[in-house]
Amino acid sequence: LRYLRLKFAFRFSSPVKKVLIMGAVIAVLMMVFHQGRYSGTGSNLVALCFDGITDDIYAYDWILKMALTILTLSSGFIGGEVAPLFSIGSCLGYVLGPVFGFDPMFGAALGFASVFCSGSNTLLAAILVGVESFGYSMLPFFSVVCFVSFIFNFNNSIFTAQRVAFTRPTRRQRLKERLSEKKNNINN
């Protein structure tokens, strides 16, 4: 998201021009990919994950929703960052659930909370959203998947102004540390 925002800012001199051109491109893409299935907040996809009909969700739904959401937000359109996380997570969980031996709807519920956790960098909020949406019986499962997704997001968030109470090393910082350690080991 950050990369595309910078790329578009460099590519288009005028923000109005960027929004007009990219809006037209996004509109065409939305119609090409299943006549608008991926437009909006994605609540339609979340509902399809839990309707019990297995043919309604495609294995690529999550990636197309994610790509189009990133493209939309990087083009300068504001709002609608959170609801697509639920949609992306539900679709991904629905697809991965059977791979790990879970019911697709159970996987969709876990994906719902864990992608929100990772995308927003909020551990407790994601667990509570999952519990509020799917019931207290899911608390242990949400706790585990949200903890794992929180650990592996390395303080990244869709919210650029978010402040964190404690910092974890980023992927780049860990790589620098490893390279300096290897360099020191070679020199010694």
Residue ranges and their predicted role:
Residues 1-188:
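Alpha-helical transmembrane segments and immediately membrane-proximal extracytoplasmic
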